[in-house]
Amino acid sequence: MINYLRGQAIEVIKTPNNRLILILDVNQIGYEIQIPSRLALDIGNNNNDSCQIFTHLLLREEQPLLYGFGTAPERELFRQLLSVNGVGAQLALALIDTLGIEELVVAIVTGNTKILSKTPGVGLKTAERIALELKTKLAAWRQLREATTTITAILPAAAILEDVQMTLLALGYSQEEIDRAMAVLSQDALFSKNTQPEDWIKGAINWLG
């Protein structure tokens, strides 16, 4: 599985069926990656400089297809959409392109089918199905993502944070468990001002049980 590709954006080609294909040169190998129009615009604004694309490989009988996104959360949302019955890759891309990641997640979590139906090809029944099947999953995902984003502004210096993470890893906790614990602790007003790694370690261990 290809997690991401980093290379030189050669060009973005628009196919006859209006799909945008990025030609990405990685070590003299040109990859064809279908991307959302929002990402194509970003690449154009950056004068086709070196970029990192988070990819999803979709295996079809005819040929394998690569889809690319500017961020890992966008790719994760794309994958969540693909898990919904009746939602294919093109519709998932259209949803992300039309609404953007934040508005799309909010619409799904709140069950706002009117907003979801703004996307071409998404009727009321499809919108209802998306909201029904993903509401709970995306509510938890959104909460963790927001908490993780908040950590950057709240946690102590990077060196202290590294000490905390290395200690917890040495104690046998996984990186995912550590991230969850730190996300929760960062919401505590006392921890947000604490610069003692020992306190963060104890707090994480207590939370993880």
UniProtKB/Swiss-Prot annotation:
Protein encoded by which gene: ruvA
Record-linked Pfam families: HHH_5 (PF14520), RuvA_C (PF07499), RuvA_N (PF01330)
Similarity annotation: Belongs to the RuvA family.
Keyword Secreted: no
GO biological process terms held by the UniProt record: DNA recombination; DNA repair
Free-text comment about domains: Has three domains with a flexible linker between the domains II and III and assumes an 'L' shape. Domain III is highly mobile and contacts RuvB.
Region: Flexible linker, residue numbers: 150-158
Location in the cell: Cytoplasm
Annotated region (Domain III), positions in chain: 158-209
Alphabetical UniProt keywords: Cytoplasm, DNA damage, DNA recombination, DNA repair, DNA-binding
UniProt entry tagged with the keyword DNA damage: yes
Organism per entry: Microcystis aeruginosa (strain NIES-843 / IAM M-2473)
Protein name: Holliday junction branch migration complex subunit RuvA
